[in-house]
Regions:
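Extended recognition patches within non-cytosolic domains
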Residues: 1-14, 21-23, 113-115, 120, ...
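Beta-strand-rich, repetitive solenoid scaffolds
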Residues: 17-19, 57-59, 66-70, 76-80, ...
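Extracellular glycan-interaction surfaces
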Residues: 1-20, 42-50, 68-139
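Conserved, ordered domain cores of eukaryotic regulatory proteins
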Residues: 46-47, 246, 251-252, 263-306
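Extracellular glycan-recognition modules
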Residues: 21-76, 113-115, 176-179, 281-283, ...
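Low-complexity, glycine/proline/serine-rich flexible segments
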Residues: 1-37, 74, 81-86, 147-149, ...
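Short hydrophobic/aromatic patches on beta-strands that form ligand-binding or substrate-lining surfaces
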Residues: 41-49, 104-106, 165-170, 207-208, ...
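Extracellular glycan-interaction patches encoded by glycine-rich segments
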Residues: 142-165
Length: 306
């Protein structure tokens, strides 16, 4: 299961929505890295479908030499040179809860003597050690991620990101563990903490998505801003790992289409169709759920199942 979006001492106030129908991306050309062989990616992700959405991609040859890290129904890490796999890791663990936030950490250090220590993948603080495909990099391999070329967030060889992204760190020159970014709270739930690990390195960045007018703004202090494409101010949303909002479930719907980060459902004309969501209602207080019809359907039913 994913993280429950519980409030913690460290609050994340917003995320960036990547609504796949808008073709959103963030782009940036990296500089000469601090260390091309050593880096860490950390991101909180809430996916909207089963496809592999790109969290970080390098691709300058149209899919012949490329690398990316994706999350969909599983986590994949690929690095290909001239069509041959240098890294190919695909988790056997599946991540099907589209109502939950997942914390993904990928730590790379290809100088390690043991191959399984050269790439470590974690989800919600747990290291993933079972892979359907497991090709680890050779020792001292210079990967294509973190090289001095154009990089993408939200689009890639294996699919576009359809979901929400929050608290996205990239640290150039350090292989870190999830303990730098999260902890288990008293209820046994993995929650975020503030990163205090020091320098981000030559290519590092911290995307907190705090500025709705500039969603690619790097708030690490390094000034490594990204260019936002097809992302509007409205794509800064309050759905976050510490304030999880309900969305419609792509695994429990009719033949209609979900969009807008699984907040909108378009039915099929002339047919009954439906979509469901999971809503966690607190034990006390007064709470409201609003559903709005954006079309001229004559019969719309809204109900609760307990």
């Amino acid at each position: 299961m994913g993280a429950a979006g519980q409030a913690t001492g460290y609050e994340i106030e917003q995320s960036c929505r990547f609504a796949v129908e808008d073709d959103p991306t963030l782009t940036r050309t990296f500089a000469t890295p601090t260390n091309r062989r050593i880096y860490t990616l950390s991101a909180w992700v809430k996916t909207c479908d089963q496809n592999g959405g790109s969290i970080l991609e390098h691709n300058t040859t149209g899919g012949v030499t490329w690398a990316n890290i994706t999350i969909g129904n599983r986590v994949d890490f690929f690095d290909y040179s001239s069509g041959s796999a240098r890294i190919d890791l695909r988790t056997t663990a599946l991540f099907h809860d589209h109502s939950a936030w997942y914390h993904l950490v990928v730590g790379v250090d290809t100088t390690q003597s043991t191959d399984t220590n050269r790439v470590k993948i974690y989800v919600n603080g747990v290291q993933q050690t079972s892979f359907g495909t497991a090709t680890y990099p050779s020792q001292n391999f210079d990967g294509h991620l973190n090289s001095a070329v154009a990089h993408l967030i939200g689009d890639g060889t294996n699919g576009k990101l359809n979901g929400y992204l929050a608290e996205n760190h990239f640290i150039d020159g350090q292989q870190l563990t999830p303990a730098s970014f999260g902890e288990t709270n008293s209820q046994g739930v993995w929650v975020p903490i503030k990163y205090t690990g020091g320098s981000y390195g030559n290519n590092g960045y911290y995307l907190a998505f705090q500025d709705s007018s500039s969603l690619g703004d790097d708030t690490s202090g390094e000034g490594h801003d990204w260019t936002a494409n097809n992302l509007a101010a409205a794509d800064q949303v309050t759905d976050s790992p510490t304030n999880n909002m309900p969305v419609l479930n792509p695994l429990s719907k009719g033949t209609g289409t979900l969009s807008d980060g699984n907040l909108e459902y378009t039915g099929v004309s002339g047919n009954w169709s439906n979509a469901r969501l999971t809503l966690l209602v607190p034990d006390t207080g007064k709470w409201a759920l609003r559903m709005k019809s954006a079309d001229s359907y004559q019969q719309i039913l809204v109900g609760l199942c307990a």
